[in-house]
């Protein structure tokens, strides 16, 4: 009986250690997508080909610096397949776009803590 209890305890520890890393960052990732959708809604008033409902499951998400930097790759325009990347920083619990970061260079130069690749992109 003790062996069974020990096995279950060890299994619980292993499963807890293997939990999905993305859950750790999900609140901040949600903030980033919400901010991006708000910006897209404003931009779509000027250019109606911009998508206004960006979803994480249709995009690529890369988390860096333990959740402080999040780069998302989205299909910005309705009729284009091209992915556009936007870098965000999480400051004081808010997602803010950082226009000083080159997202492609940043992704090449840094190792991601978490990646969620939902759209296949040709790596150059």
Labelled PLM ranges:
Residues 10-11, 43, 116-118:
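Low-complexity, intrinsically disordered short peptide segments enriched in small/polar/basic residues
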Residues 27-46:
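Post-signal peptide N-terminal segment of mature Sec-exported envelope proteins
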Residues 3, 24-27, 37, 92:
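Intrinsic disorder/low-complexity segments enriched in polar/small residues
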Residues 47-124:
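Extracytoplasmic electrostatic interaction patches
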Residues 18-22:
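Bacterial signal peptide processing site
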Residues 9-10, 95:
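Enrichment for repetitive, rod-forming helical segments
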Residues 13-17:
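C-terminal motif of bacterial Sec signal peptides marking the signal peptidase cleavage site
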Residues 1-4, 8-9:
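Positively charged n-region of N-terminal signal peptides that target proteins for export
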């Amino acid at each position: 009986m003790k062996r069974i209890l020990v096995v279950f305890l060890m299994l619980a520890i292993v499963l807890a250690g293997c939990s999905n890393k993305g859950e750790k960052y999900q609140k901040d990732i949600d903030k980033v997508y919400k901010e991006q959708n708000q910006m897209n809604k404003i931009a779509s008033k000027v250019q109606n080909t911009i998508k206004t409902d960006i979803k994480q499951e249709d995009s690529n998400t890369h988390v860096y610096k333990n959740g402080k930097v999040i780069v998302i790759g989205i299909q910005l325009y309705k009729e284009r397949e091209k992915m556009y990347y936007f870098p965000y920083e999480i400051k004081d619990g808010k997602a803010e776009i950082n226009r000083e970061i080159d997202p492609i260079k940043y992704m090449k130069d840094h190792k991601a803590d978490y990646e969620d690749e939902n759209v296949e992109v040709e790596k150059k």
